């Protein structure tokens, strides 16, 4: 071919995000179903919260990064700042996959390992770096060395305060996990519908997801409309 297509460009973006498609990794039917619900859990929780980046694609095609599937969200326009609500929403979205597994299968898997890491990272940063905890206010609890080289971070507080920080991190992640569960419980029929579609087609575009998602969806009671 002489020209790259839009699909080629999208695949290039996905290679950067998640690696190449690993077509020789064949999931069992049960694993494929679990991954379908897991990814749709992320997407639904994201869609049902304010100020969340739009879902562009959901797929259960394994990638060389090790991901068995992923949900792609892309900000509309440039976005340099995140407020407290947006960060809490990100944490809730990270927990959405595990929440879907719990709700549908009554069991949890190892598939949420990266989600757990990211949710914890965001929660800790909110408390130690961004002053988003009322008790600590605008006191820096963490310092970062070689910030522009992806440097290491270290806590700059007493052991007692570090213990309290750990408690605050756990509390924050738990709260957002419960929020994710509530969103999925309120929209369980859509969860089933979209997960079934993903299971059958392996990939859903953002347009397809939004077309289905906003048909008779139940909005959270605290959502601003």
Outline where the language-model segments fall:
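Ca2+-coordinating acidic residues in Ca2+-binding motifs
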Residues: 8, 208, 221
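C-terminal helical "lid" subdomain and adjoining coupling/linker elements of P-loop NTPases
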Residues: 1-8, 16-33, 131-137
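Short, conserved phosphate-binding/catalytic loop or strand-edge motifs used
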Residues: 10-15, 64-67
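Single conserved hydrophobic/aromatic residue that forms the stacking wall/gate
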Residues: 216-225
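Generic detector of well-ordered alpha-helical packing
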Residues: 39-40, 225
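Soluble catalytic regions of large protease machineries
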Residues: 33-37, 43-217
């Amino acid at each position: 071919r002489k020209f790259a297509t839009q699909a080629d460009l999208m695949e290039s973006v996905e290679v950067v995000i998640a690696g190449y498609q690993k077509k020789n990794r064949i999931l069992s039917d049960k694993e494929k179903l679990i991954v379908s619900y897991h990814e749709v859990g992320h997407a639904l929780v994201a869609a049902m919260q304010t100020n969340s980046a739009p879902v562009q694609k959901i797929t259960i095609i394994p990638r060389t990064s090790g991901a068995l599937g992923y949900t792609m969200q892309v900000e509309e326009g440039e976005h340099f700042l995140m407020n407290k609500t947006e960060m809490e929403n990100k944490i809730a979205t990270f927990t959405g996959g595990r929440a879907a597994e719990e709700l549908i299968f009554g069991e949890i898997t190892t598939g949420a390992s990266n989600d757990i890491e990211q949710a914890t990272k965001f929660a800790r940063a909110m408390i130690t770096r961004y002053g988003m905890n009322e008790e600590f206010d605008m006191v820096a609890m963490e310092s970062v060395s070689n910030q522009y080289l992806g440097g290491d971070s270290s806590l700059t507080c007493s052991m007692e305060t570090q213990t309290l920080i750990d408690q605050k991190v756990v509390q924050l992640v738990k709260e957002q996990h419960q929020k994710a569960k509530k969103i999925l419980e309120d929209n369980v029929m859509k969860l089933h519908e979209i997960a079934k579609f993903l299971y059958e087609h392996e990939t859903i575009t953002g347009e397809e997801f939004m077309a289905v998602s906003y048909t008779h969806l139940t909005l959270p009671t605290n959502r601003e409309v």
